[in-house]
Amino acid sequence: MNCCAHVLNTVLRNAFDDRYLAQELPDLLEQLQKVKAVVTFLKQSGLTSQLPHGVCQEICTRWNSKLAMIKSVLSQYDAIENLLDSRGNLLLEDVNKTLLTEVAEFLEPFKEASEKLEQDKVVTLPLVLMYYTKLKKHLTADSTDSPEVCQLKSRTLEFLQIKLPIEELHKVATFLWPPFRHLRVLDEQERKGVHDRVRELLIDVHLRLPQGETSTDHPDYEPPAKRTSLDEFKEWRDAAETQPADSELDRYLRDSDSCEDIEKLLELWEAHRRKYRGLSFLAKKVLCIPSTSASSERNFSAAGYVLQDRRTCLKPESLDNLLFLHKNM
């Protein structure tokens, strides 16, 4: 699976490609360039010290820096305008504040999705399908949107559907999050496909697991059954076919147990390891898969800070210990 954070970055980089904006949305490109020029002037002139807060400059390799730049200007727009007017500077004169606000609102859900998917101490794979659906809904043009934002949404939606295909594993992971077990985010055919796939996986899991009681729903003691007239013919009686995969899946679908906090999802499945023996095993196997590689990249960055040109004599175990402390303290 692709890193979802990288995919979102690629989607937005293509959506805000300068060549595309210059041809199709020149007014939007002009507004973004004006904001960038304002931030550059404030930083180079040292005037940021006279503002309530600092301003952020856009970095071409990070789409979220575009949002940070716009918000840093809009949040103190009046203060910046007064400061520039006092110096006879007209950089803000033709800035379309309404359009910039729309662009910020357009980018905000992507920021939320990226931050949630890049968490490294929380299960994130079930969130991929949910945020994908939420972003698709967000990218549906609204009657209140400006023509520029409508076109931007259309282009971004096109790239999102191409670059971020929802895989079977994403759907299974969402199914294993109890509040969304019925997969109402999918249509009926897709739901059936996920259920069929989970049944297949459970059959394989039950073959691998040692035989034994699979549920604590049954009491430890049951009174002996009364003898019936059929007992004398029991050797010829039809055997009831047991299908642990089906019964376990059906019980899970009927269950009312929930887990609103995704941070406790693995704890829930650990607590249900006897009630749902196969599903618990499957959940631990699937939910441990991260949706992004952000955590690994943060560790690589930390390693670069720890192991420097003047600090190359560290033993491998010392480097590992320092990285462990950096990660967990």
Can you annotate each of these PLM segments?
Residues 58-60, 94-103, 116-126, 161-165, ...:
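Conserved, non-catalytic sequence blocks in retroelement Pol enzymes and Pol-derived host proteins
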Residues 1-82, 89, 152:
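Surface-exposed, charged/polar loop-rich segments
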Residues 207-209, 259-260, 307-329:
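Polyampholytic, low-complexity intrinsically disordered segments
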Residues 80-248:
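Extended, C-terminal/distal alpha-helical "rod" segments
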Residues 14-17, 74-75, 84-86, 185-188, ...:
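Short coil/turn segments at secondary-structure boundaries
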Residues 6, 38, 65, 70, ...:
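Mobile genetic element proteins and their domesticated derivatives, centered on retroelements
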Residues 47-53, 274-289:
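Short, hydrophobic/aliphatic alpha-helical segments
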